[in-house]
Swiss-Prot record:
It comes from Acanthamoeba castellanii. Belongs to the universal ribosomal protein uS12 family. Pfam families: Ribosom_S12_S23. The keyword Ribonucleoprotein applies. It is found in: Mitochondrion. Its main location: mitochondrion. Keywords: Mitochondrion, Ribonucleoprotein, Ribosomal protein. One of its GO terms (biological process) is translation. This is Small ribosomal subunit protein uS12m.
Length: 127
């Protein structure tokens, strides 16, 4: 326990919290344009071919974002919506693209029946 005199000489400092999604500048999402599409291999214990996109945000910042799901229709100069959320086994990938917005369509290479609704995309009802 510090003494009163010690606290007078060296006041307590608040902890600084780092922001992992600095390119979004405090916004929940930002619009971006695809510059390059790539396939990247993950870190050591995992083995796959993950799809990522290099984007230019509306603030003219360049970032790398993960493309979720099976199959995509993105090309160079496609408009996309970016949110925070990293891919744990891909170094340097701290952002994720949102499906169903702008040029990034919701359709996947095969239909999922078990996947829950996300971003207001309703599941097919059985009669």
């Amino acid at each position: 326990m510090p003494t009163y005199h010690q606290i007078l000489k060296n006041p307590r400092r608040k902890k600084m919290h780092t922001n992992n999604v600095k390119a979004l500048e405090g916004c929940p999402q930002k619009k971006g344009v695809c510059v390059k599409l790539r396939i990247v291999k993950p870190k050591k214990p995992n083995s796959a071919q993950r799809k990522v996109a290099k984007l230019r945000l509306s603030t003219r910042r360049m970032i790398i974002a993960y493309i979720p799901g099976q199959g995509h229709n993105l090309q160079e100069y496609s408009s996309v919506l970016v949110s925070g959320g990293r891919a744990p086994d891909l170094p340097g990938v701290r952002y994720t693209l949102i499906k169903g917005k702008y040029d990034f369509s919701w359709k996947e290479s095969f239909e999922r029946k078990k996947k829950l609704s996300k971003y207001g995309y309703s599941t097919k009802k059985k009669f």
